[in-house]
Amino acid sequence: MKRRSVLAALGGPLFPAATDGPLPNVTFNKADAKRVPDPSGELLIYFDGPTDMCKRMTAGSLRLKPGATPHPPHEHPEEEFMVVTEGAGEMFCDGKTVKVAPGAMMYCAGRKLHGIVNTGKVPLTFYFYKWRV
């Protein structure tokens, strides 16, 4: 299931304390994140909603199983950062594929094809942040 489909199914903003406005100043722990079923691994959504500066901000992580990808390369209107914290794989953005390991960070502008695949023998964890202003 694509993350976009998952987020649409979740409905409104996600964060620990319900408010009517943008995200308050807050620190998220893993236990606060919404666990979302995903066949490629463990998908956690920490936040999906408005912030002080963004109409919509989505922040989450995905622990990809060995050999897995969350979906084929795709595009969406939001800009996105992805940060690898565990494992090894490949990130694809705008026609370029790069091998990645912990500490790698990708920025991809909106409406550019991008994706990630776990090419290793252990899980690959990455955090993603995308927003619309």
Model-identified regions with their sequence ranges:
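Cofactor-binding loop segments of dinucleotide-utilizing enzymes, especially the Rossmann-like FAD-
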Residues: 86, 94, 129-131
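Ligand-binding loop in jelly-roll beta-barrel domains
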Residues: 54, 110-133
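A short, N-terminal "cap"/entry segment at the start of jelly-roll beta-barrel domains
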Residues: 3-56, 65
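Exposed loop/turn and edge beta-strand positions of beta-sandwich/beta-sheet ligand-binding modules
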Residues: 58, 77-78, 110
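Conserved short histidine dyad/triad with adjacent acidic residue
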Residues: 45, 60-76
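Short, conserved beta-strand element in jelly-roll/cupin
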Residues: 63-64, 75-91
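Tight coil/turn sites that cap or link beta-strands
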Residues: 65-68, 103, 111
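Short acidic-glycine-tyrosine-enriched beta hairpin
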Residues: 96-109
